[in-house]
């Protein structure tokens, strides 16, 4: 749960983080975090918050850099009939990061769809390689924070991550076959569609709507 490492952008914080990493590497010890809420596994009785559901697990895996987003997603998705299999809040991942959890969830037979909330990635090449592999076998839906200048500054102070440019990120995610969303509501709706509706083949899709402005909001 601790913070106060490199995300503070101070010499003391960076030195403390380096000391922690050195000790972990010497002991061959894997750490989730720091600055996170850890694991949620309803069937194993492990949760991040006392209000989270415990019991039968579902088909969704969720990976989040933000603890509050991880908790909020698990509770709202449960209210809407989407049950979590496993969820992890990993903070700024000084040992295990988004690529590690995505690779693990991709191999988990109990997880049929994966949702992610990311603020930045440390090793872009490895992340894209893992994402391409996992997305070829099961759907991956990604909500990325920090898509504005102010959001990027907030992320740097929150998890110490650097958000890449929007165009670069969008292009890379599209090439890997993942689905992008822009809110937790859209994330849940997309996962519901993927889990409960038959797959759409080809391009025979029509969109009907009321107000013209809302239909023209995005390309």
Which role fits each region the language model picked out?
Residues 1-219:
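Catalytic-core regions of core metabolic enzymes
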């Amino acid at each position: 749960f601790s913070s106060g490492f490199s995300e503070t952008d101070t010499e003391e914080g960076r030195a403390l983080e380096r000391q922690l990493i050195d000790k972990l590497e010497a002991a061959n010890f894997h750490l989730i975090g720091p600055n996170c809420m850890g694991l949620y596994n309803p069937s194993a009785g492990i949760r991040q918050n006392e209000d989270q559901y415990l019991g039968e697990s579902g088909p969704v895996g969720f990976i989040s850099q933000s603890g509050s987003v991880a908790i909020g997603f698990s509770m709202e998705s449960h209210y809407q009939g989407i049950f979590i299999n496993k969820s992890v809040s990993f903070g700024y991942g000084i040992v295990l990061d988004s690529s590690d959890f995505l690779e693990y969830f991709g191999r988990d037979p109990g997880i049929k769809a994966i949702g992610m909330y990311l603020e930045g990635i440390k090793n872009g090449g490895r992340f894209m390689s893992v994402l391409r592999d996992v997305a070829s076998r099961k759907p991956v839906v990604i909500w990325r924070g920090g898509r504005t200048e102010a959001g990027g500054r907030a992320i740097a102070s929150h998890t110490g991550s650097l958000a890449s440019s929007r165009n670069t990120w969008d292009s890379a995610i599209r090439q890997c076959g993942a689905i992008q969303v822009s809110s937790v509501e859209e994330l849940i709706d997309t996962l519901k569609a993927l889990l409960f509706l038959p797959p759409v083949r080809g391009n025979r899709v029509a969109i009907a709507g009321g107000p013209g402005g809302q239909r023209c909001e995005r390309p």
